[in-house]
């Protein structure tokens, strides 16, 4: 912007017309916001003078814009430092003006400047301005003695400066602190509040000596004024208590050593006799609020007072000296009288409700911060809290209900796998399970520890009283109904079977809340969320007598005008339909008809919200599918509308999903409707939208699978199938897999429609077979497709030979193929051969392949293919290799072991294993004999053996082969143990996997043998033994778990092994167990965790210097071990948090935040976010120590000669830090009061590079939203 334009703006600012002044300020503000203005020195001075003058403008809107403009000028790089100093000099004197308006305007302007200044670490200008500003404010308070109103403004400004830039002016800390402390004793409460706030901001930045002096002075004043003897002393004590609480909140762990000195005073103030000292209620409230702070910030220091704190808080929760509650029965009889009595009291007459509310919040803090005492708290506090649900004040009652919700949330964190531990009545339980019955529900002790069972027992003991009380409260206090529902939702999530016996009472009460005309939309959403959980987590038979109220809930919520409630009602309706289907013989059919009326109305409407329309489409499809016989008359109109919805871009995706559900139920669209739908499919599969293509393919697959012959229009289906060849590609194997499934059903059920496209389809398949990516589900689907092609008769069907030649053409045409591609082609060839069910063709192919394998001039690619295919033929068509057959594939495999081509050697091992899988009786003894006699080929032979063991451990075949295999286990075990101590890591890895899988067959006898090998002096053998345990662990319930749980501790003790590699393997096994089956290791953690923490330390003796040519490079041999330890911590935090001391855990994590390794840092950033979710108080207590390494990382700059990879890694770390900062800001609102965190956050906001990265992080988080959510069917 030119100086001329700036001059014009300045002229307009002094124009007599207020509209000109307003527009000039507005234009300047926009230019400053967008950065389109660059002020020169002279222009800046003119603008500043004009804006200062406008602060006294007669028009309020102009004044407000002037304030905003001055604030924007204070932003980084807008104006020079001396101009900022000038602004401070000009504005500060007006803060002490006797004219109230002038004082307020200039105070707001200075505050706007403070808020816009750059973080001190990145701006010298900020430091200069703050050092000019703060002394003026402090001196004015101590010397000028302005009136009280000015004091409030100045204290507020000092507080803002200290909050954001307290670390910039350490020389002013002592003076600022003295001023703040002096104002603690002012007679004006507003001044006292500002002084307390300022002390809190200072507490987080002052040095240790000044900090201790501050706390000691406050404690001294507290002691001198205790106990209170007058109203004035009450006020002073309350102020001191709040000041100490604020200091503790701001400084966290720094206050720890002072906490034991403060808590006794607070407990003393709570013991004052309420009968004679009712004026102490404000002091009681402040004392309880102080306890809440200490419980969150210094929980370990409060443990010594736990018993007395619980007693005082529970007493305070019931502290209501002005009201007599009476017995419960009496309450019910005198309900109306009681309501009248409540109207007699108001906040002005009775402030005891504040004490009770504070007590509720403090109890919640104790529950959240003392997780290690949760059983004791549940037993002692739980019943008291339930008894206080009768509280007469709504705000207090809401807080009390929140306390029990917090208790349930903490229990759900400590017992996250409760539903897995439930043993259903019809479940085939493992015979040796230890079953514990709690509240009528059977639990397996293999999934729950003793402490977890005790907590669930405590909850079960309180459940009946809780549900009776909460049901009564919902009827008696409709306003707190949604909060009661929130509690019930928490209960059903924590203790899924807890509501089964009480649903008959709860559902009608919930229905009344939803249908109440005064209920809020949020309240209705809460009710529907509870109903959803109840329907999902309870047996449908439990709702047999509740269909009518449930239908009322559904119809009322679906008909709700507010779209959010209506959409949620339709979502819950989908789950209700499942219940109705199970109870169709008990009135479900009639309720379905009622439900259809409201759902169909939403489905047919064209003017509804998009979300409601989509949910209605899903719900109507589920209704039709579940009650197709009952709703026959309504079906045609619905199918016609569904066809219309498919043709619209906004609803086609969800309509296709719904239509898939409909055709799976056997409901038939008319021929005309299918013609329209299939034409749309042809168009949609060509579009970019991946989710739409997949949904279309799924619909076509289910349509062909479930539709009777002649019901699908041939011409349109042929067109759809013609598009399949274009969808077969390595770029998207999921869509390719779906296309293969469609083609399989097409060849089986509609061969004439697909035969026209045989060649394009085959060409696409052959192109795909050259890809190294074809494996897994896509390969399995392709094999099924070839089976369908071979077994189905259709016009111009290719012969066996031509089909085989086409599939194997990439091998013989010398196309460059990966090993995965060779395996895929070999599998296809074997499946095609198997599908012919012609043994002669199989043997002919085997002879041909054997000849190619032995021909000297054959390419390595053909040899590799021949070897794999010979093995696959043995797996799939074992009769090929009869005793009199001249080709001996086992001899060919052994011979291939001597080949120079490594891939051929591996293929031979795999082929030998495949042969044994197909014919265990012949080839397993052969493999074992070779292992005994061929020591130089052990590695390859062990791979062949592993192929057999893996197949047997996962086989669903008859027990014949398994019995045969079991008889050989002893021989196999001996051979494996003989190779467990090899020097090659690959061999030991194979041996470990085989040992682990073998132990699953006979854990009682084999695990002790494996344990004996832990005594070996060879660390390689110990490593193999520990690693074997990893292959015994998965997330399924198996009989091996019982034996493993008893003995796994002996293997995990290797975390203290003298060998580094053994320790690393032990940590990997611990991590695997904690992730897949935490019950195996939960009770061992008190002993194992110290060893895990020990391995997170950086050990300098393990850092070696290696010379690489002219360069020296440092190699950290302990890095892998350190990574494993931190990974283990991360996993344990999710699955075994009940056994973790969060304080000790957080200390180890903090060290990891400063680790030099990129991966370790990223892992600890994730861990920090998880700790913030589970124990927010712990993070708040240590926020200073957390912020320091985060800020250090943000300030790291790449080396001048850094390569691209280094720059990208650094950028990744900075993005991770930004995610952590934003996550902490979202999860912990109080964190914004901390100067260190605020400085960290402002560093991101005011640094261009970091701000750009932050924008990228936000965009990435938005892209991470999953739009392709499946239709709700459960």
Swiss-Prot record:
Key assembly factor of SCF (SKP1-CUL1-F-box protein) E3 ubiquitin ligase complexes that promotes the exchange of the substrate-recognition F-box subunit in SCF complexes, thereby playing a key role in the cellular repertoire of SCF complexes. Acts as a F-box protein exchange factor. SUPFAM superfamilies: ARM repeat. Disruption phenotype: Worms show impenetrant phenotypes, including developmental arrest, morphological defects of the vulva and tail and reduced fecundity. Worms also display supernumerary seam cell divisions, defective alae formation, and the accumulation of the SCF(lin-23) target, the glutamate receptor glr-1. Increased levels of the neddylated isoforms of Cul-2 and cul-4. This is Cullin-associated NEDD8-dissociated protein 1. It comes from the Eukaryota. Pfam families: TIP120 (PF08623). GO terms for cellular component: nucleus. Keywords: Nucleus, Repeat, Ubl conjugation pathway. The keyword Disulfide bond does not apply. It is found in: Nucleus. InterPro entries: ARM-like, ARM-type_fold, CAND1/CAND2, TATA-bd_TIP120. Residues 325-349 have a biased composition (Acidic residues). Belongs to the CAND family. PANTHER family: TIP120 (PTHR12696). HEAT repeats lie at residues 41-79, 127-167, 375-413, 500-540, 617-655, 671-709, 1000-1038, 1041-1078, 1079-1117. Interacts with cul-1, cul-2, cul-3, cul-4, cul-5 and cul-6. One of its GO terms (biological process) is regulation of protein deneddylation. The gene is cand-1. Residues 320-349 are annotated as: Disordered.
């Amino acid at each position: 912007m030119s100086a001329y334009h700036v001059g014009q703006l300045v002229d307009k600012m002094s124009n007599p017309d207020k509209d000109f002044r307003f527009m000039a300020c507005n234009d300047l503000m926009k230019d400053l916001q967008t950065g389109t203005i660059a002020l020169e020195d002279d222009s800046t001075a003119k603008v500043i003078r004009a804006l200062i003058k406008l602060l006294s403008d007669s028009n309020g809107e102009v004044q407000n814009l002037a304030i905003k403009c001055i604030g924007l000028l204070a932003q980084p790089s807008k104006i020079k430092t001396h101009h900022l100093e000038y602004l401070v000099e000009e504005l500060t004197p007006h803060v002490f003006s006797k004219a109230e308006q002038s004082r307020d305007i200039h105070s707001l302007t200075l505050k706007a400047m403070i808020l816009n200044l750059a973080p001190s670490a990145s701006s010298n200008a900020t430091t200069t301005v703050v050092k000019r500003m703060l002394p003026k404010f402090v001196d004015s308070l101590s010397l000028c003695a302005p009136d009280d109103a000015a004091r409030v403004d100045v204290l507020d400004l000092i507080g803002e400066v200290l909050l954001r830039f307290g670390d910039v002016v350490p020389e002013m800390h002592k003076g600022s602190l003295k001023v703040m402390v002096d104002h603690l004793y002012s007679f004006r409460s507003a001044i006292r509040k500002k002084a307390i706030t300022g002390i809190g901001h200072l507490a987080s930045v002052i040095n240790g000596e000044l900090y201790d002096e501050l706390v000691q002075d406050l404690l001294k004043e507290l002691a001198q004024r205790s106990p209170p003897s007058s109203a004035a002393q009450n006020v002073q004590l309350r102020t001191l208590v709040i000041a100490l609480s604020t200091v503790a909140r701001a400084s966290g762990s720094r206050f720890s050593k002072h906490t034991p000195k403060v808590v006794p005073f607070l407990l003393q103030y709570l013991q004052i006799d309420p009968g004679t000292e009712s004026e102490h209620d404000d002091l009681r409230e402040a004392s309880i609020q102080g306890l809440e702070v200490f419980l969150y910030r210094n929980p370990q220091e409060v443990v010594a007072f736990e018993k007395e704190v619980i007693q005082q808080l529970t007493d305070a929760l019931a502290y209501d000296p002005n009201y007599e509650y009476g017995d419960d029965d009496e309450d019910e009889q005198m309900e109306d009288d009681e309501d009248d009595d409540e109207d007699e009291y108001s906040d002005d007459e009775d402030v005891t409700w504040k004490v009770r509310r504070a007590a509720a919040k403090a109890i919640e803090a104790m529950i959240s911060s003392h997780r290690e005492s949760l059983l004791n708290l549940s037993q002692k506090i739980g019943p008291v809290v339930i008894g206080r649900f009768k509280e007469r004040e709504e705000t207090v009652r809401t807080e009390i209900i929140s306390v029990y919700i917090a208790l349930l949330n903490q229990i759900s964190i400590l017992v996250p796998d409760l539903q897995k531990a439930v043993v259903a009545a019809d479940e085939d339980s493992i015979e040796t399970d230890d079953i514990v019955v709690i509240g009528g529900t059977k639990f397996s002790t293999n999934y729950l520890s003793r402490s977890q069972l005790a907590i669930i027992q405590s909850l079960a003991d309180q459940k009946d009283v809780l549900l009776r009380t909460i049901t009564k409260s919902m009827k008696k206090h409709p306003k707190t109904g949604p909060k009661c529902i929130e509690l019930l939702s928490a209960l059903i999530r924590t203790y899924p079977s807890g509501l089964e016996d009480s649903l008959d009472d709860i559902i009608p009460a919930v229905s009344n809340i939803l249908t109440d005309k005064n209920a809020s939309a949020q309240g209705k959403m809460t009710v529907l969320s509870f109903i959803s959980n109840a329907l999902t987590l309870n047996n449908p038979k439990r709702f047999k007598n509740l269909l009518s109220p449930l239908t009322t809930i559904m119809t009322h919520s679906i008909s709700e005008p507010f779209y959010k409630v209506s959409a949620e009602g339709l979502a819950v309706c989908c789950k209700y339909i499942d219940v109705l289907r199970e109870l169709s013989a008990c009135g479900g059919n009639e309720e379905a008809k009622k439900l259809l009326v409201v759902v169909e109305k939403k489905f047919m409407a064209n003017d509804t919200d998009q979300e409601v329309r989509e949910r209605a489409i899903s719900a109507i499809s589920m209704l039709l599918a579940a009650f197709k016989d009952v709703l026959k008359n309504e079906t045609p109109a619905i199918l016609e509308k569904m066809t219309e919805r498919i043709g619209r871009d906004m609803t086609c995706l969800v309509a296709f999903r719904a239509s898939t559900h409909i055709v799976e139920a056997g409901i038939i669209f008319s021929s005309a409707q299918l013609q329209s739908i299939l034409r749309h499919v042809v168009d949609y599969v060509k579009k970019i939208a991946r989710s739409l293509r997949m949904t279309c393919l799924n619909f076509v697959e289910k349509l062909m699978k479930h539709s009777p012959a002649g019901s699908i229009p041939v011409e349109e289906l042929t067109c759809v199938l013609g598009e399949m060849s274009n969808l077969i590609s390595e770029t998207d194997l999921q869509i390719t897999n779906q296309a293969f499934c469609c083609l399989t059903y097409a060849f089986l059920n509609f061969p004439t429609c697909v035969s026209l496209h045989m060649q394009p389809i085959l060409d696409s398949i052959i192109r795909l077979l050259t890809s190294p990516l074809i494996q897994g589900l896509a390969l399995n689907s392709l094999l099924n497709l070839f089976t369908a092609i071979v077994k189905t008769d259709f016009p111009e069907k290719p012969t066996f030979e031509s089909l085989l030649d086409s599939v194997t053409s990439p091998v013989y045409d010398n196309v460059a193929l990966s090993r995965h591609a060779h395996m895929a082609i070999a599998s296809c060839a074997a499946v095609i051969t198997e599908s012919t069910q012609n043994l002669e063709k199989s043997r002919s192919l085997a002879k041909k392949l054997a000849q190619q394998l032995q021909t000297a001039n054959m390419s390595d690619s053909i040899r590799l293919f021949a070897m794999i295919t010979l093995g696959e033929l043995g797996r799939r068509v074992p009769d090929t290799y009869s005793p009199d057959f001249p080709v001996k594939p086992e001899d060919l495999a052994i011979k291939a072991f001597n080949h120079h081509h490594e891939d051929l050697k591996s293929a031979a091992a795999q082929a030998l294993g495949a042969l044994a899988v197909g014919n265990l009786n012949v080839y397993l003894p052969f493999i074992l004999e070779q292992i005994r006699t061929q020591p130089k080929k052990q590695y390859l032979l062990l791979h062949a053996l592993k192929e057999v063991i893996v197949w047997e451990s996962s086989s669903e075949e008859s027990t014949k082969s398994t019995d045969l295999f079991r008889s050989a286990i002893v021989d196999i075990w001996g051979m494996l143990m003989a190779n467990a101590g090899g020097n090659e890591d690959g061999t030991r890895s194979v041996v470990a996997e085989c040992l682990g899988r073998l132990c699953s067959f006979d854990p009682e006898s084999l695990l002790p043998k494996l344990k004996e090998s832990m005594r070996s002096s060879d660390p390689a053998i110990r490593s193999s033994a520990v690693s074997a345990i990893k292959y015994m662990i998965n997330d399924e319930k198996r009989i091996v778990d019982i034996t493993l749980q008893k003995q796994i501790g002996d293997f995990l003790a290797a975390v203290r092994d003298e060998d580094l590699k053994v320790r690393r393997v032990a940590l990997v096994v611990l991590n695997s167990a904690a992730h897949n089956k935490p019950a195996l290791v939960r009770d061992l953690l008190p002993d194992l965790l110290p060893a895990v923490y020990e391995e997170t330390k950086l050990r300098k003796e393990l850092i070696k210097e290696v010379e690489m040519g002219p360069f020296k490079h440092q190699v950290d041999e302990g890095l892998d071990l350190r990574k494993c330890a931190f990974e283990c911590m991360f996993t344990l935090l999710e699955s075994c948090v009940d056994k973790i001391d969060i304080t000790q855990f957080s200390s180890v994590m903090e060290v990891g935040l400063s680790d030099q390794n990129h991966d370790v840092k990223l892992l600890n950033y994730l861990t920090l976010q998880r700790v913030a979710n589970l124990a927010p108080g712990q993070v708040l207590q240590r926020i200073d120590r957390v912020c320091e390494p985060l800020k250090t990382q943000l300030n790291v700059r790449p080396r001048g000669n850094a390569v691209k990879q280094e720059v990208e890694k650094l950028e990744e770390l900075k993005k991770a830090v930004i995610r952590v900062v934003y996550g902490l800001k979202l999860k912990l609102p109080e964190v914004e009061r901390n100067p260190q965190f605020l400085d960290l956050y402002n560093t991101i906001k005011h640094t261009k590079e970091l701000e750009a990265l932050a924008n990228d992080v936000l965009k990435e988080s938005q892209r991470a939203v999953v739009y392709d959510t499946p239709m709700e069917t459960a």
